[in-house]
């Protein structure tokens, strides 16, 4: 009940009028940069709006970064991302720096738990970690993540920025009095978001290859009297389709002092720790935008009259809304299953303690090792599929409002902004092709056989559990058989291909994996039976799984006999059980 109350209160808070006013201000007053003084002396002065700053403070205080670092609990990530899901539609992009802050905190925590840091490194990283995970806006930091360069793009191995070791006695302090690092970095970063952050994790070449570095954004001047940029200057801010409140810049690095993270030449390995976090953020953030868009569509349907009747009573309108809601439900199950896996992997002891004496059947995951394998495989799929589906889903939401959906007046109705901002999720942290290639690397890499085995064991375990549940619930047997057939096809048709063939068919492979996992999760949800706290009846749960496996074909033959029952279920799926007809016919499997 405590979590439910927390989420309910937070959900109410993020849609209050003062929040929409802050969003509006952040949108209407995008960041600006001043690069020179009146007399032509170079300087970098970044200005962000009051709305942006206040929204960032609100998110920090709510713990959108801090929650998983405050408690060693496998469910902390679920709690964090449920709040983020509610927050994203109101955050005016402050979750972008927050996601990178989360990734940086994860990376520093990993190194602080080891024994390879020098005393100075440990001191500096400890202070940075404290600030990254703080809920106090006056103390908290955000972090940038600088990888992209003109020559390399997503291929970070073509990074041209260079780091030179200048010695531990080089001296200097950052803006907070901590010693500057022994590396000097120079180069150019073509695309860097969260330019107003207090630190950054970045990639640069050393004599031993691509390496990762920690660097503060500001340092104390040599005379100790002023604070200046730590060898960073903003060349320009990026003009963008969306994310307008977010300061995204081209950066020139000239003598940026930094600390090496990990070993030289292992930059990709180190930065992957951040990417694994930010990709989950991307998936859940996309779902947050989509969920907000659907909420607006539902609210509109309840008040908009066409030809004297509310849209919520228009069967064709409700059918389209139900189809969108089905896609949303499937992607929500997939996205939050990925979050569950992340929490288990990060807090294995908590998971093991919670499962002592509990049979495997009711658990979505049977072991930490299984969670690790599934997380590595499913994270890029979640990132890609959730962001792309949200883009399509939000387009449907815009269309459902008619001309209102294209307008950007009041922020509480502004689906256009949600669509614009979400579309960045499709591209950054890896496009579709980059994610598809990553999946092939997972399946054909060193641990590929182990990960494949873990995946199919998981599918088998869940289907067995659902078979047992189907003895008490009509309509599940056919769904179990259909998913089993999909899983077999995945194994026999796709995973027998060579790496080269898989890369060519990367999108189709990703879709096949996604549909199996989403089907299993929707089936698992249906097997729980009657109405739960979500308000979904068992008929709706079964229907969601059924429709996922058998999507309605707009060009297929019309069966008038099925019209009444699907229309009633459409209403429940789109608008909730409170709106459903009390005369809902007994459910019949549509397989």
Where are these predicted regions, by residue range?
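C-terminal amphipathic alpha-helical interaction region
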Residues: 446, 462-591
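Alpha-helix capping/hinge segments and adjacent helical runs
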Residues: 369-458, 553-587
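Extended, hydrophobic alpha-helical segments in both membrane/secreted and soluble proteins
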Residues: 128, 141-145, 159, 184-188, ...
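Extended, charge-enriched "interface" segments that sit outside catalytic cores
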Residues: 1-73, 587
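C-terminal helix-coil-helix/basic helical segment that borders enzyme active sites and/or dimer interfaces
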Residues: 330-383, 494-504, 527, 531-534
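A glycine-rich, basic-preceded beta-loop-alpha segment at the flavin cofactor/substrate interface
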Residues: 223-227, 235, 247-278, 295-313, ...
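Internal helix-loop-helix
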Residues: 41-134, 138-139, 193-194, 428, ...
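A short core secondary-structure module
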Residues: 178-229
